[in-house]
Regions:
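C-terminal transmembrane helical hairpin of 12-TM major facilitator-type secondary transporters
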Residues: 315-362
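C-terminal ends and interior cores of transmembrane alpha-helices
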Residues: 98-115, 327-340
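Hydrophobic core of transmembrane alpha-helices in multi-pass small-molecule transporters
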Residues: 103, 117-134, 332, 343-358
Length: 437
């Protein structure tokens, strides 16, 4: 049984924290974990050219390596969410960070000279995906317990701005390490960062606000008053989750979202260097732009959602913002490939990434709103759809580019974005999930 926070003596538990802000300290630390997780995820895209040369891989086989991570990540979303619901985000996220640090290190240890080197690399990346699968279902379980409904847009936006921050700092940081020390060191340093944030998370976090010694009565009352009164107390059955129109519609939209997002995570750096002809240094700087846009637009979209929610309700605040943002992303994606200048194309496509991330918090806020204590499980199912979109784009993008040119993958992504926006028309964020549904 998890001990009460007052019984745990650590250096952190004896410190003072700003009164009434403990929930935001945990959200900030989820931002940090999110950033490191995405740094660990996209470092292989930056080092992809060096790895491909050493292992003798073309873009198709390199796409298999990219897909292996996403496939493992996708398959374990729902189980990871259920684990977070059952054992709490504190323990599960700590185990996850240790797991992914180990397999990030093993990526660097794979040698091109061993038998079945490609299969070994694929297996290691698959296992890394399994470890990272617990991150966002765990964060959503934390949000469901710690964050009042009216603050969830901003909270989720801040957490997912870590995606842009981590992926944005990856190009210059990984490029510097790669040039100075070789690609393997990029993975060892990334692994060390994961271990550090995981250890600090275990010391700092608690699963519930009433378990944390820093939480004052006023903050606890504020949190409890803002939680949905009809939150589900018993775990939702899998049949209830998979049979929900809300969950299916959100998962479809998040599949489309993931398809688009993974073009930036897996292929954008390679697109700038190999297709647009930018040198390594320029590619690293312009490759940051989509992720900077993500880091800015994710909390911005969440904040706008919270503001609109107070005046117009959740349907406009969540569904309207998400649909409009994803449609705007489609416009930028269609315009980017026709820009003749590589730098202009980078800026336009970065606008598409930013517009996409204006919708990010809506997905996670709706799932925490409708699922209560099963928020980890429901968001895990939703995020499985997102990652399956990533599986498709990791392999389909180089295929389309090879046979039809590099403009086509972006046009296909724009069309898929339209489908993702339309799916939000079927979502009712005011309808809570129950096992009687």
């Amino acid at each position: 049984m998890e001990p009460q926070a007052t019984e745990i003596v650590t250096p952190l538990s004896t410190c003072s924290a700003p009164r009434g802000r403990v929930r935001w300290i945990l959200i900030f630390w989820m931002f940090v974990i999110s950033a490191i997780a995405y740094l660990d995820r996209v470092n292989i895209a930056i080092a992809g050219h060096s790895i491909a040369q050493e292992f003798g891989l073309d873009n198709i086989r390199l796409g298999w390596v990219f897909s292996a991570f996403v496939f493992g990540y996708a398959l374990f979303q729902a189980p990871g969410g259920r684990l977070a619901d059952r054992f709490g985000p504190r323990k599960i996220l700590t185990i996850g960070t240790i797991w992914w640090a180990v397999f990030t290190s093993l990526t660097a240890l794979v040698s091109a000279g061993v038998a079945h080197a490609l299969l070994t690399l694929i297996a290691v990346r698959f296992a890394l995906g399994v470890g990272e699968a617990v991150v966002y279902p765990s964060s959503n379980r934390l949000v469901a317990a710690w964050i009042p409904t009216q603050e969830r847009g901003l909270a989720n936006g801040l957490i997912f701005s870590g995606v842009g921050a981590g992926a944005g700092m990856a190009p210059p940081l990984i490029t510097f390490i790669l040039v100075q020390y070789g690609w393997r060191w990029a993975f060892w340093i990334s692994a060390l960062m994961g271990l550090v944030v995981g250890a600090l998370w275990y010391l700092l976090a608690r699963d519930k606000p009433e378990e944390h010694s820093w939480v004052k009565p006023a903050e606890l009352a504020h949190i409890k008053a803002g939680l949905p009164q009809s939150q589900v107390q018993k775990p939702l059955a899998w049949g209830t989750i998979f049979g929900s129109k809300n969950v299916l519609a959100i998962s479809l939209s998040y599949f489309c979202y993931g398809y688009v997002a993974y073009i930036f995570f897996a292929w954008f750096f390679i697109y700038l260097s190999n297709v647009r002809g930018l040198d390594l240094k320029s590619s690293s700087y312009y490759g940051m732009l989509p992720f900077i846009a993500m880091a800015i637009c994710s909390p911005l979209g969440g904040w706008v959602s919270d503001v609109l929610g107070k005046r117009f309700g959740k349907r406009i605040a969540r569904c309207g913002i998400a649909a409009a943002s994803i449609l705007l992303s489609a416009v930028f994606l269609a315009m980017g490939p026709v820009a003749h200048d590589a730098r202009i194309a980078s800026i336009v496509l970065a606008g598409g990434a930013g517009a996409l991330y204006l919708s990010q918090s809506a997905f996670w806020s709706v799932t925490s709103d409708i699922a209560g204590r099963s928020a980890g499980s429901v968001s895990g199912v939703m995020n499985m759809g997102n990652q399956m979109g990533g599986v498709v784009t990791a392999s389909l993008t180089p295929f389309l580019a090879k046979h039809f040119g590099w403009g086509v993958p972006f046009y296909v992504a724009a069309a898929i974005s339209v489908v993702g926006a339309l799916a939000w028309l079927a979502v009712d964020p005011s309808k809570n999930l129950t096992n009687e549904d």
